[in-house]
Amino acid sequence: MRFAIVVTGPAYGTQQASSAFQFAQALIAEGHELSSVFFYREGVYNANQLTSPASDEFDLVRGWQQLNTQHGVALNICVAAALRRGVVDETEAGRLGLASSNLQTGFTLSGLGALAEASLTCDRVVQF
């Protein structure tokens, strides 16, 4: 079965993102296809490369990145939500005159069209 996940919670502070990550790992372990994860609202903080969790905590941002590199899962973040919350790639940083970018490698700024496409092409869309 083909799945897409929508994450609306930040990397730290709520269970939404960590539950979504554990669900994603379980899907892959059970042989399902996870085509994409769409980060929306506060979920865009999962793509901030400047997060620095304590050494005894799981690094969720890098966990998502590994999911992308090891399993080819597309990590799309809503561009409008990201810009409002200060998560930008190099292109947007340059366009906005910002000194630097902070989008973690493996994540892609995208519009709601990516979520709509996932909804149409997947068997299930699960929101956290």
Curated annotation (Swiss-Prot):
<keyword id="KW-0808">Transferase</keyword>
<dbReference type="InterPro" id="IPR027396">
    <property type="entry name" value="DsrEFH-like"/>
</dbReference>
<comment type="similarity">
    <text>Belongs to the DsrE/TusD family.</text>
</comment>
<protein>
    <recommendedName>
        <fullName>Sulfurtransferase TusD</fullName>
        <ecNumber>2.8.1.-</ecNumber>
    </recommendedName>
</protein>
<comment type="subunit">
    <text>Heterohexamer, formed by a dimer of trimers. The hexameric TusBCD complex contains 2 copies each of TusB, TusC and TusD. The TusBCD complex interacts with TusE.</text>
</comment>
<dbReference type="GO" id="GO:0016783">
    <property type="term" value="F:sulfurtransferase activity"/>
</dbReference>
<keyword id="KW-0963">Cytoplasm</keyword>
<comment type="function">
    <text>Part of a sulfur-relay system required for 2-thiolation of 5-methylaminomethyl-2-thiouridine (mnm(5)s(2)U) at tRNA wobble positions. Accepts sulfur from TusA and transfers it in turn to TusE.</text>
</comment>
<feature type="active site" description="Cysteine persulfide intermediate">
    <location>
        <position position="78"/>
    </location>
</feature>
<dbReference type="GO" id="GO:0002143">
    <property type="term" value="P:tRNA wobble position uridine thiolation"/>
</dbReference>
<dbReference type="GO" id="GO:1990228">
    <property type="term" value="C:sulfurtransferase complex"/>
</dbReference>
<dbReference type="InterPro" id="IPR017463">
    <property type="entry name" value="Sulphur_relay_TusD/DsrE"/>
</dbReference>
<keyword id="KW-0819">tRNA processing</keyword>
<dbReference type="GO" id="GO:0097163">
    <property type="term" value="F:sulfur carrier activity"/>
</dbReference>
<dbReference type="InterPro" id="IPR003787">
    <property type="entry name" value="Sulphur_relay_DsrE/F-like"/>
</dbReference>
<dbReference type="Pfam" id="PF02635">
    <property type="entry name" value="DsrE"/>
</dbReference>
